[in-house]
């Protein structure tokens, strides 16, 4: 799916970074309505995500404001693979779990594992703000961000699937 498009449907930015954003909606459509076309379409989105985002580690441009690599693209890839793992079985399910793990490690690279030493006189420094566990935004918009949505829940689930207890500690 194009990242940006006009009202008439023509592409403004044909980058496929927004593709995983459609997956959860398609999976839920399949669950609610039982229509296998939704599941087939969801799988096609993750086929694209695997080949163009996860495999080359090019988590790029899933939002309208940043035309660069960003954690939002990684979290969208994590979420899309999680949703497909939840509705598949056997080897297919394991494949989506493996993709989810790979995307999760990349997404975690955007989260602070330390407390940034903010200078005195800066608001966050004066407040004694601790940045550990908070996300950074992107290389274009370098600031602390609250964007996590389902990520902690997915990490906890993934930790049990792959026997990685560290993932559960984010929850």
Regions found by a protein language model. Give the residues of each.
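Glycan-recognition and catalytic cores of secretory/periplasmic carbohydrate-active enzymes
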Residues: 1-171
């Amino acid at each position: 799916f194009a990242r940006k498009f006009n009202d008439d449907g023509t592409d403004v930015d044909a980058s496929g970074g927004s593709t995983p954003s459609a997956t959860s909606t398609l999976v839920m459509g399949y669950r609610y309505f039982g229509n296998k076309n939704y599941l087939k379409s969801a799988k096609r989105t993750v086929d694209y995500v695997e080949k163009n985002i996860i495999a080359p580690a090019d988590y790029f441009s899933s939002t309208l404001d940043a035309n660069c690599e960003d954690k939002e693209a990684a979290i969208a890839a994590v979420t899309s693979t999680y949703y497909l793992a939840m509705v598949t079985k056997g080897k297919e399910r394991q494949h989506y779990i493996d993709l989810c793990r790979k995307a999760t490690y990349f997404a975690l690279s955007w989260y602070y594992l330390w407390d940034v030493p903010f200078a005195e006189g800066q608001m966050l420094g004066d407040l004694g703000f601790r940045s550990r566990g908070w996300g950074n935004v992107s290389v274009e918009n370098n600031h602390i961000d609250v964007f996590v949505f389902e990520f902690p829940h997915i990490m906890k689930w993934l930790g049990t699937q792959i026997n990685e207890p560290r993932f559960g500690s984010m929850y």
